[in-house]
């Protein structure tokens, strides 16, 4: 089928109501940018899941980063999208005047800073899903090879698959998943096979152009209509079915899995990545960061993260919570659902 036939099919779909979840902030943005919702039947509802690593990072992690940055002769490197995430003791941005915090553009900046001043402890706020984990692993491999000992990694690195299983277990009304393209470049598509079989739901990997997303929605709908539940790869120009073997090997050498807390979901076994024994000396206090701030009842960030509501259904959306003054983490990041919805609606 060509794209016109796909649009015609989706626009005229009149089967049972369907709820399809994407778990990638770039997909969320692309769906808005290309007006995908206007091209499909109102019976096909597209919702956002836990696709933003910044948004699911717990309060305790922010506080741990702040505490490190306030240590004597210590400096914290972080990507800019972490600066406004609220912690129990304020955000990194709010603590910047009393803490040594630098916005980085690459984890490898830590090596140069550590070499420039061996007496200073350089902390790296490592937040992300499988897409960004190899960069942190390679940086630590390089530091270890060069005998650099004054780098510390504070990790909130997570893997997407356990969160998808949490959704399947706790959100029975999700009918199918638009799987993340960037993450799947690393993991491949076979990681979704077991979930598709166990829960009877389609898992289809999508690219980021309008036609990619529309084709993915079409394949999910067709699978549901024909009683199928399989994983499919519709992003073959970037995603290999078996993933990136070299990247996976690097991750496995440096990191091991353990429990991690996700905002909105709670603790999920095996979803966190922590430094293995031979790299443990580089850990900056990453384990056991489970405490999370209770947001006021009016803030429904947790419900947004798991797709229970759309961002504009939150009573604080645009009313005391916007990208300039975010209250919840979903409004902070460029990949956060609330931030994307706000920028596209205003």
Model-inferred region functions:
Residues 1-119, 133, 143-146, 154, ...:
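Metallocofactor- and cofactor-centric catalytic cores in central/energy metabolism, strongly enriched
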Residues 19-20, 150-151, 226-236, 262-263, ...:
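Flexible, glycine/charged-enriched surface loops at secondary-structure junctions
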Residues 24-27, 129-131, 157-161, 181-185, ...:
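Glycine-rich beta-alpha junction loops
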Residues 33-34, 90, 136-138, 190-191, ...:
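Short amphipathic alpha-helical segments
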Residues 125, 129-191:
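Phosphate/pyrophosphate-binding betaalpha-module
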Residues 152, 171-237:
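A conserved active-site cap/scaffold subdomain adjacent to cofactor or substrate pockets
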Residues 215-303:
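Internal helical hairpin/lid segments
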């Amino acid at each position: 089928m060509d794209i016109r036939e796909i649009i015609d099919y989706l626009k005229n779909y009149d089967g049972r109501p369907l709820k399809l979840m994407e778990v990638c902030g770039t997909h969320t943005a692309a769906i808005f940018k290309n007006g995908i919702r206007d091209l499909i039947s109102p019976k096909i509802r597209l919702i956002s899941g836990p696709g933003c690593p910044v948004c699911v990072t717990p309060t305790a992690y922010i506080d741990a980063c702040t505490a490190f940055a306030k240590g004597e002769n210590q400096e914290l490197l972080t990507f800019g999208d972490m600066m406004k995430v609220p912690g129990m003791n304020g955000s990194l941005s709010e603590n910047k005047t009393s803490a040594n915090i630098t916005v980085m553009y690459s984890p490898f900046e830590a090596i140069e800073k550590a070499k420039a001043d061996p007496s200073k402890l350089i902390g790296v706020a490592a937040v992300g899903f499988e897409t960004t984990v190899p960069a942190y692993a390679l940086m630590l491999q390089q530091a270890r090879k060069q005998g650099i000992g004054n780098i510390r990694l504070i990790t909130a690195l997570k893997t997407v698959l356990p969160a998808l299983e949490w959704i399947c277990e706790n959100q029975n009304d999700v009918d199918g998943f638009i799987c993340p393209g960037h993450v799947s470049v690393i993991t491949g598509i076979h990681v979704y096979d077991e979930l598709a079989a166990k829960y009877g739901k389609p898992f289809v990997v999508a690219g980021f152009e309008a036609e990619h997303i529309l084709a993915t929605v079409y394949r999910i709908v067709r699978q549901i209509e024909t009683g199928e539940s399989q994983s499919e790869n519709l992003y073959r120009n970037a995603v290999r079915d078996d993933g990136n073997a070299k990247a996976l090997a690097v991750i496995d050498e440096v990191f091991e899995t353990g429990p991690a807390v996700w905002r909105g979901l709670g603790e999920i076994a095996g979803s966190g990545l922590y430094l293995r024994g031979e790299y443990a000396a580089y850990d900056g206090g990453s384990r056991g960061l489970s405490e999370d701030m209770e947001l006021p009842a009016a803030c429904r960030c947790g419900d947004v993260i798991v797709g229970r509501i759309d961002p504009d259904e939150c009573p604080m959306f645009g009313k005391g919570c916007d990208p300039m003054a975010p209250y919840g983490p979903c409004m902070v990041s460029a990949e956060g659902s609330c931030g994307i919805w706000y920028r596209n609606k205003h």
